[in-house]
Amino acid sequence: MTEVVAALIWEGETFLICQRPAHKARGLLWEFVGGKVEPGETREEALVRECREELAVTVSVGEVFMDVVHEYPDLTVHLTLFHASIAEGVPQKLEHNDIRWITVEEIDQYEFCPADEVILDRLRKQNRSEKGARYAGLYLR
């Protein structure tokens, strides 16, 4: 099983997504920034390294948002998605075809990697319940 980490980076009501390069597996699909954990690295160290390599930013790694195991035809991944924030830098497209800041409502406009679907479902559900709570006069966060 391949250990993979990714970052859920929020900026206001939007979060960062990245489009995979066309020449890679699952090319042109959208994903959260991240990558494989190298031998001797913690998951948090791997995430900091991947964000620096792929976006030229330094991130502060927070709590785990979700763990997912997904079987692709060519490999099985254990994906850990962390909350993260940009501590330094502005995201740049160093390895991705494109990067975007999107709202939860815009998720369906993008085709994501299959491993991310369960994460996106959770984001949609949380968004609906937060909007409902705000409507009722309660404020979460």
Residue ranges and their predicted role:
Residues M1-L16, K36:
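Conserved N-terminal beta-strand and adjoining loop/helix that marks the start
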Residues A46-R52, V64, F82, I99, ...:
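Hydrophobic packing within well-folded, soluble alpha/beta domains
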Residues A115-R141:
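Charged phosphate-binding loop/patch that engages nucleotide di/tri-phosphates or the phosphate backbone
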Residues H83, Q92-L123:
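NUDIX/MutT-family hydrolases
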Residues T58, V68-V90, R100, L123:
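Active-site-adjacent beta-strand/loop module that shapes the phosphate/pyrophosphate-binding cleft
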Residues E54-V61:
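Short secondary-structure junctions
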Residues T14-E53:
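Conserved Nudix-box catalytic region and its N-terminal flanking loop in Nudix hydrolases
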